[in-house]
Amino acid sequence: MDSPVTGERARPLIAIPARFSSSAAALRFEAEVAARKLVEAVYAAGGEPLSVHPAAPGGTVSDAEVARRLAFADGVLLPGGGDLNPVYYGGAQHESLYDMDLEQDAFDLAVARWSLRAGRPLLAICRGMQVVNVAMGGTLVQDMPRHHRHVRSELALRPGTAVHGVLGHDTVTISCYHHQALDRIGTGLHRTASSEDGVVEAIELTEPGDGWFLAVQWHPEDTAADDPAQQRLFGALVSAAASKRG
């Protein structure tokens, strides 16, 4: 779609479910936020990042409602955030869990289901990958024996996987911040990268459909401005969104 004002090709619209926050600088009350590095990476890739209010009153929202609200989006980015309530995957609540919000969880899960079902290009990061896994029937390790917080490490990638194709290297440096990890992999998904200690770092669809999808456990936005390999993840999402738009 071209801009009616300039005639230039309009940026693909990338929907990003906002994160609920108890406070934010310059705001007096509770807020909805998106990580600045995340939206800047999307914008640098040529996309137009748009925050979406994660409305799910009482922790309930229908997939049909999410489909209606996100119909405008050319692509979707599920970002990091707090812990997913284990009620969604049949687990008892561990004492280490934090920042849980049933409204946020319900909305994100519905977004994941809709994106995959509708074939809408989807990049899922950290919590976002965990949400996709749970949405597809998978489970999580609620508190890893060894947390990956403020950690940068080397990750080996397997040729032939989508994540290898996008990043373009056999080994990349990743920035991690998480204390949870994937346990049982959801239906229709498979792991395509793992850390040296066995943590699932990337998942893809077992049988890719019409829409582009990739999920990673690390935070590519942390280093995207200085690492072209990490920025290519956002470029791949925006490119797929542009192709979907036609």
PLM regions: where:
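Short, solvent-exposed loop/turn elements at beta->coil junctions and helix N-caps
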Residues: 177-181
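N-terminal beta1-alpha1 cap of cysteine-dependent amidohydrolase-like domains
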Residues: 1-123, 134-136, 141, 145-167, ...
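The feature captures the ABC ATPase H-loop/switch
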Residues: 129
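Active-site-proximal beta-strand elements of phosphoester/diester hydrolases
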Residues: 214-218
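Conserved G/P- and acidic residue-centered "switch" motifs that form tight phosphate/ATP-binding loops
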Residues: 126
